[in-house]
C-alpha cells in the first residue's frame, strides 16, 4: 500500500475522525510494509517524511484548510524539517503517527509528528515548519489570518527561542 493508497485511505476516513481544532492531535495507524523497508528490514528514513506528510494532510483536511486553500488559491508549503530516530520500526510492525500543530508566528507554523510503537514508546520525532503561499498576493499568508478564516479563535503559545530559529531557517 504505497503512498497514494495510504493518502486515499486517510482522505476517505477523515470525517470519521471528526473536525480538527488547534490543540487537537491527528492519530493515524499504519503497518510497516515490504515497500517501506530498507536493507535493514526496518522503516526507510524517507518513509518517515512521507508518513509525516500524510499526518499533515489529515490535519489540513479535517481543519478545513484544503477547501479554504482551494477557494483562495493558496498552497501549503514546507519550509524545513528536523528528524530524530530513536527506535526502529521493523517490518510488519504496527505504529501510529501522532501529528499536532505546536505553535506559529507570523507566516510560519511548527508541526510535530511523533511515530509511536504499539507499546507507547516513541520511535521517531519529526518537526516541520510550513507556511501557506498566496499566489495572488505573491507572498505567505499570516497564520493568524488562516486560523481566523477557519473559524477558530485561538492564540498560539509563544515559540521558544529554538522554535523561532527553526522557523527562520
Which positions does each model-derived feature cover?
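Short coil/loop residues immediately preceding or within conserved phosphate-binding loops
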Residues: 27, 78-80, 110
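Short amphipathic
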Residues: 23-33
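Active-site helix/loop of acyl-thioester processing domains in fatty-acid/polyketide metabolism
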Residues: 47-70
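HotDog/MaoC-like acyl-thioester-processing domains
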Residues: 1-16, 22, 89-96, 100-169
Amino acid at each position: 500500500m504505497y503512498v497514494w493508497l495510504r493518502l486515499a485511505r486517510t482522505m476517505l476516513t477523515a470525517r470519521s475522525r471528526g473536525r480538527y481544532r488547534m490543540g487537537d492531535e491527528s492519530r493515524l495507524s499504519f503497518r510497516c510494509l515490504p515497500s517501506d523497508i530498507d536493507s535493514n528490514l526496518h522503516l526507510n528514513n524517507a518513509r518517515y517524511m512521507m508518513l509525516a506528510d500524510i499526518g499533515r494532510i489529515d490535519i489540513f483536511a479535517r481543519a478545513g484548510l484544503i477547501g479554504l486553500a482551494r477557494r483562495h488559491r493558496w498552497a501549503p508549503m514546507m519550509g524545513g524539517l528536523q528528524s530524530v530516530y530513536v527506535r526502529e520500526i521493523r517490518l510488519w510492525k504496527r505504529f501510529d503517527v501522532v501529528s499536532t500543530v505546536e505553535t506559529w508566528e507570523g507566516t510560519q507554523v511548527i508541526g510535530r509528528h511523533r511515530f509511536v510503537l504499539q507499546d507507547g514508546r516513541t520511535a521517531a520525532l519529526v518537526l516541520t515548519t510550513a507556511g501557506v503561499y498566496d499566489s495572488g498576493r505573491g507572498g505567505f499568508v499570516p497564520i493568524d489570518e488562516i486560523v481566523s478564516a477557519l473559524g477558530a479563535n485561538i492564540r498560539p503559545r509563544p515559540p521558544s527561542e529554538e522554535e523561532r530559529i527553526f522557523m527562520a531557517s
